[in-house]
Amino acid sequence: MLVLTRKVGESLLIGDDIEITVLSVRGNQVKLGVNAPKNIVVHREEIYHQIKALADNIPESV
C-alpha cells in the first residue's frame, strides 16, 4: 500500500484521468473530491460492499 501525506488543496493523481483532492480536514474526518471520467465507477467502501452483497444474492438466470 502506498501511503501519502497531503494538505488541504493538494491532490493525488491516479493515471491520466483520476484526481483526488483533499477539500477539508475536521478532527478525524477528511473531505475528498474525486474528479474522474463518467465511465469510472466511484463508491465509498461500505456502499461498494452493499452493492456486491446484493449482486451476490441475485440468482443467475438460466
From Swiss-Prot:
GO molecular function: mRNA 5'-UTR binding
Transmembrane segments: none
Record bears the keyword Transcription: no
GO cellular component: cytosol
Keyword RNA-binding: yes
Lineage: superkingdom: Bacteria
Keyword field: Activator, Cytoplasm, Repressor, RNA-binding, Translation regulation
A Gene Ontology BP annotation from the UniProt entry: mRNA catabolic process
InterPro entries found in the cross-reference section: CsrA, CsrA_sf
Compartments, record wording: Cytoplasm
HAMAP family documented for this protein: CsrA
Role description: A key translational regulator that binds mRNA to regulate translation initiation and/or mRNA stability. Mediates global changes in gene expression, shifting from rapid growth to stress survival by linking envelope stress, the stringent response and the catabolite repression systems. Usually binds in the 5'-UTR; binding at or near the Shine-Dalgarno sequence prevents ribosome-binding, repressing translation, binding elsewhere in the 5'-UTR can activate translation and/or stabilize the mRNA. Its function is antagonized by small RNA(s).
Subunit text: Homodimer; the beta-strands of each monomer intercalate to form a hydrophobic core, while the alpha-helices form wings that extend away from the core.
Family: Belongs to the CsrA/RsmA family.
Name of this chain's protein: Translational regulator CsrA
UniProt source species: Haemophilus ducreyi (strain 35000HP / ATCC 700724)
